[in-house]
Amino acid sequence: METFMRRYSFWLTTALGACALAWLVASWRSAPMLQRLPVIYIVALAVHEGEELRFPGGFVELVTSMTGIEIKNLGLAKFGLLCFTVYATVVPALLAGAGMVWPVMATLLIGVIEVLAHLAAARVNRRCFYSPGMATALAVQFPVACYGFWWLGTQGLVQPIYWLWAALFLLVPLFCLQAAIVRSNGQPWHEFMGGALRAMARAGREGHRE
């Protein structure tokens, strides 16, 4: 599993994006827009992964160098991330077929989080504002998220409580995944977070002085 995921996780995500694109082409007229939104985002996410990991790639290495923290079981981490991707995109697409709105909102929230993550990386890495994945986060994922939220709002589908449900649906499993990856590294989660925050703050100060 470790070796397989190290080698092929990118291609699995790419295949997921290709399947999503094929579904959109075949079902654009018949599928409701509510269901199309998370599927569109799957395509956007696959494009984003291409920039982060291959063209030009290097986002994982950048984060590792900024924080000074190395992931020992990278294949396991990639498997967990792939499972989370399916959970946060494919599952909402299926639930949207039953008319459920807040899971779709959870998918769209990823587009906002991705932008914030890359802006945070830019703040820490003073030597270069760009980080691999930033262009597609800003030009692809974020516009898809904004359009999706705009469409949901104009259709009167969003209720205030949906924001809470969407956030919980997305963030609780994400934090659990992070904790599991850290645990597989042989480190308590609070120590990992403290070390990462200190390393990022130190990198930011050093970059600022330069």
Where are these regions (language model features)?
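The first (N-terminal) embedded transmembrane alpha-helix
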Residues: 5-24
